[in-house]
Amino acid sequence: MNQPRTRGPIARLFIGLWDAVNFSRRLVFNLLFLLVVFVLLAAMLGGGKLAPLAERSTLVIAPEGRLVEQYSCDPVSRAFARATNGNDCREIRLRDVLRALDAARTDKRIERVVLHLDELQPSGFASLRDVATAIGRVKAAGKQVIAYGDNYSQGQYVLAAQANHVYLDPMSQGGVMLEGLAGYRQYFRQGLQDKLGIDMHLFKVGEYKSAAEPYILDAASAESKEADLFWMNDLWQRMLADIGRARGLDPAALAANIEAMDAQVAGANGDLAQLALKQKPVDGQKTREQVEDLLLEKGVADDTAEGGFRQVALDTYVQHLDGALPQADVRPQAAVAVAAGEIA
């Protein structure tokens, strides 16, 4: 009968080391898992009871993500994205922003509104226009609105233009990037027919039906260009009119400056911030610290708050508004279904 093989001391040493490494690996991964669970729970619970909203507070609106009618992610995914600073599920519900702005207009506890739009991602013009109109109502009610940022994209500036004062950070070398509207589409006829030998047969009714053009043409048809220019020009003129009205600028002069942007930038030696200051889309150049000093001077000091001035974030203010709502109406309600994306 064979005797069990006895391991030598060196083998037992390496086996022991491997067991220790394996145990450490499992311990570290389990601790990381527990940490993630703890962070998710903390993010979802939101820290418990809200502190009362103090008088003379500044409402800080710093959206991170794009404006949407309805969240596309579940609460757990949104909480995880916030906790890990991820790009997925970064969305701001449009009605929350509108509710906050409309409430701040008459809320005596809110002294002013600050817009920090650096993290606002491209959003639909209809949503941007709704928010811009709400900002205008706050300003019309006599409350100061201040916008500041490192750089303003076209969508971000649609909102910033409504502020009483618009500032650019001189350290960021950013500017106001108004560039108009454009549409891009890929065309596949050459690849399908000439290279793959696929013959496409398209039957359509109406000259302006262009959805299937990429399969039979190498470029947009005249009718497709005409249709796109029709809605793009209309949208662009509305955007210029809104910006011009808010900033006291002539929309035609604004459009002319954008058309000659290359020459304008060259004339400013590539300094986009100075160009924006010269053309009046912004009121001045201030660093983040200078803006915070300005808000501290006009507001109330708070050593526990970021920037040192008394403030309330958008999410927190919406929670205050939710807490003040009456009990749910038990009568039958009309549900609104939000549809987004392509119909396939």
Regions found by a protein language model. Give the residues of each.
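Short acidic-hydrophobic, aromatic-tinged amphipathic segments that line or gate anion-handling sites
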Residues: 166-168, 282-288
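Small-residue-centered hinge/linker elements
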Residues: 2-265, 292, 296-344
